[in-house]
Design a protein with these regions (language model features):
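N-terminal secretory signal peptides and thylakoid transit peptides that target proteins
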Residues: 1-21
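Metallo-beta-lactamase
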Residues: 30-32, 123, 128-134, 138-150, 178, 194-202, 206, 213-215, ...
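Conserved beta-strand hairpin/beta-sheet module of binuclear metal-dependent hydrolase folds
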Residues: 38-132, 234-251
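Active-site metal-binding loops of divalent metal-dependent hydrolases
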Residues: 56-57, 110-113, 147, 174-175, ...
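Metal-dependent catalytic neighborhoods of phosphoester/phosphodiester hydrolases
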Residues: 153-160
Length: 323
């Protein structure tokens, strides 16, 4: 007997499912919809360390036009549609790893905090941490890739007091100086500067500035990645011979800025430098098969990057429920 499914039979099946759903409507109404998603986290092992990825929620950018630059808008929308993504609303995740090294708990980037600059779907990091059983006081070090609001906005709470009472903070000095500069309050960068000053100045006495190439914490090495911001940095995280690269904002989108790595992103301080940096570092990562943890890729943002004839391709790693 030949086993085949025709388009007609699939459509008939779909119609049948629709009818059964309608018939069951009264039963479904007895169980009210919750209408929300829980805070979420994901754990995996890295050598002798345990990594907990916590979500700050989703960051909707809206239509790609004007944000992703240098490629015709129709082509950008087709790239999204071809990958079953909305061509009308680009949505980024916000994934922060917390690395438990045994003697230290290290958080990378703090999310949007209480700001709703990009809408109501951000600002979940503290809830995600609580769900994962991690308290703010457990964090010993907060490592910042750069000083944009979606990465430093969760340093202080609604009362403008630091949320991580026992933490030291690590950032590139060039980024701190640039984004806390009072002289930029009258410039188009005002909103970014206001949020940077609000979050970074209250912890100024606990800030440590790292240098390019420096292993400033055991197992955490800074790698300068300028362009997105002047001091934007990615980090190599290593434990017992196992490593991953935390990419920060080296690439915001797993399709657009990998398939077309020289496409420009409107939030980059220096878009050309950002593209050059992206290609250079992704070449190194792909050639050495270094696993990556990306702040803005689809949850939980952990996977691998391979070089293609025109750019790069991201392969998400399957989630493992056994540690």
């Amino acid at each position: 007997m030949t086993q085949s499914v025709s388009r007609r039979s699939l459509l008939a099946l779909g119609a049948g499912l629709g009818a059964s759903t309608l018939l069951g409507g009264s039963a479904l109404a007895k169980a009210p919809k919750l209408g929300t998603q829980p805070a979420y986290f994901y754990r995996f092992n890295l050598g002798n360390s345990e990594v907990t990825v916590v979500s700050d929620g989703q960051l909707p950018l809206g239509p790609p036009k004007g944000t992703f630059i240098g490629v015709p808008d129709d082509e950008v929308k087709k790239m999204l549609s071809d990958n079953f993504l909305s061509p009308d609303n680009v949505v980024l995740e916000q994934n922060s790893p917390i690395v438990n090294m045994g003697d230290k708990m290290v958080l990378f980037d703090t999310g949007m905090g209480t700001s709703k600059a990009f809408g109501p779907t951000t600002g979940r990091q503290q809830k995600s941490m609580a769900e994962a059983g991690i308290k703010p006081g457990d964090i010993d070090a907060v490592v910042l890739s750069h000083a944009h609001i979606d990465h430093i906005g969760g340093i202080v709470g609604a009362d403008d007091k630091p949320l991580f009472p026992n933490a030291q903070y690590y950032i590139a000095q060039s980024d701190f100086d640039y984004w806390t500069d009072e002289g930029k309050l009258g410039s188009p960068l005002k909103d970014f500067v206001v949020h940077a000053r609000k979050n970074l100045l209250p912890v100024r006495d606990r800030l440590v500035f790292f240098k390019d190439g420096q292993e400033f914490l055991p197992g955490v090495q800074a790698m300068a990645a300028p362009g997105h911001t002047v001091g934007h940095t990615i980090f190599m995280v290593t434990s017992d011979g196992k490593s991953f690269a935390f990419l920060g904002d080296l690439t915001h989108h797993p399709i657009l800025l990998l398939e077309k790595p020289r496409m420009q992103f409107s939030y980059d301080t220096d878009p050309k430098q950002a593209a050059d940096t992206r290609v250079r570092l992704l070449d190194t990562i792909a050639a050495n098969k270094i696993p990556v943890m990306s702040y803005h890729f689809a949850w939980p943002g952990f996977g691998h990057i391979a070089k293609t004839s025109e750019g790069f391709h991201y392969y998400p790693e399957a989630m493992n429920l056994q540690l």
